[in-house]
């Protein structure tokens, strides 16, 4: 897996065991950040990756100009891969080993990205625990109850949807 744009363009990111995680495909990452770029200024912005896995989404955010990234990962083996990926790029960001639904930082984020492992059916719960933010991005394959959220944009890539919301 490689970072697709920005200061780390082309740099390799190690993916954990694919039986446990499903890293976001490069074409979907590119589309996500291209859409996001039309919505906010990345410079000085903050990005929360709730179910970080390898960390590719947060690393893409840093590479493209986000100043602050917080990545949360529950699985200890995957967290080690996440740490190593950040270290390999010399990035010092906030990495939290814990359950995203219980370890949510209570601070403002410009962007919150939610893609639970194996689409674990926790979207509604994740949406209920997030704090203030400008944009929420969901990557999902199933219908999600978005009551209480404003739909900004939704795009489909194969069987996956990228849904951009405002709280």
What does each model-found stretch correspond to?
Residues 1-167:
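Class I S-adenosyl-L-methionine-dependent methyltransferase catalytic core
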């Amino acid at each position: 897996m490689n970072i697709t744009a920005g200061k780390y363009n082309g740099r390799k990111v190690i993916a954990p065991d694919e039986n446990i995680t499903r890293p976001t495909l490069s074409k979907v990452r590119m589309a996500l950040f291209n859409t996001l770029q039309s919505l906010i200024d990345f410079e000085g912005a903050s990005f929360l990756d709730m179910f970080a896995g390898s960390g590719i989404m947060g690393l893409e955010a840093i590479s493209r100009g986000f100043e602050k990234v917080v990545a949360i990962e529950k699985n200890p083996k995957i967290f080690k891969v996440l740490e190593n990926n950040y270290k390999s790029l010399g990035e010092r960001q906030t990495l939290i080993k814990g359950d995203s639904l219980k370890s949510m930082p209570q601070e403002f984020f410009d962007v919150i990205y939610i893609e639970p492992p194996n689409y674990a059916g926790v979207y509604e719960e994740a949406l209920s625990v997030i704090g203030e933010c400008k944009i929420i991005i969901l990557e999902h394959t199933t219908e999600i109850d978005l009551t209480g959220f404003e739909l900004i944009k939704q795009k489909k890539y194969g069987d996956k949807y990228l849904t951009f919301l405002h709280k």
